[in-house]
């Protein structure tokens, strides 16, 4: 039986993408993940995550979805972040099931739930994959929990790959934009980068999530200044 873990990295930052990853492995091989020292990606160093990512990609089956800031900005005009995440989670799950050509079988899917209502999150996710369940005659057990990345090795694996992938993207951004900080809205370096960029270019960078309060504050401040000048 195949087990799948799904998690994301970069849900909260004001800069950069959200990376969603589904990781699958045969249930009887789950012990191999524990032997690798797989755990919550936030407890691992950046170098350790990068090292484990390579090992995990060779050990199991991986499907990723990278939602750049521009796509998140566009999607948030019509749906909220939870819906964006559920859509991405269901997409990687379905892609992985198709890639592995799983039919007439049992699957367990473990998810790190973003919503405060884990049951609602679980039901929404199941609705999104209902078509592939029927089409392929699958018996699927879904476990959606908070901090699943700290409880289930298969989710930890997905978390590590997603986080390491995002680390690489942020490093690339730093080569282009300079010191952008951590990308989190509470980071003074990130706030300064956004303010300085806006001051110089009269717009926010493409890597900024415009629906976040940090960006809205900069845009609102600019509008108020313009009104005062006029």
Curated annotation (Swiss-Prot):
Enzyme Commission no: 3.1.26.4
Keyword set includes Cytoplasm: yes
GO biological process: DNA replication, removal of RNA primer; mismatch repair
Cofactor: Mn(2+); Mg(2+)
Co-factor binding details: Manganese or magnesium. Binds 1 divalent metal ion per monomer in the absence of substrate. May bind a second metal ion after substrate binding.
Subcellular location: Cytoplasm
UniProt cross-references to SUPFAM superfamilies, sorted A to Z: Ribonuclease H-like (SSF53098)
Recorded GO MF terms: manganese ion binding; RNA binding; RNA-DNA hybrid ribonuclease activity
Recorded GO CC terms: cytoplasm; ribonuclease H2 complex
Domain RNase H type-2: 1-224
Pfam families: RNase_HII
Source organism, top-level taxon: Archaea
Enzyme class: hydrolase
Family from the record: Belongs to the RNase HII family.
Function in brief: Endonuclease that specifically degrades the RNA of RNA-DNA hybrids.
Name this polypeptide is given: Ribonuclease HII
Chain's gene name: rnhB
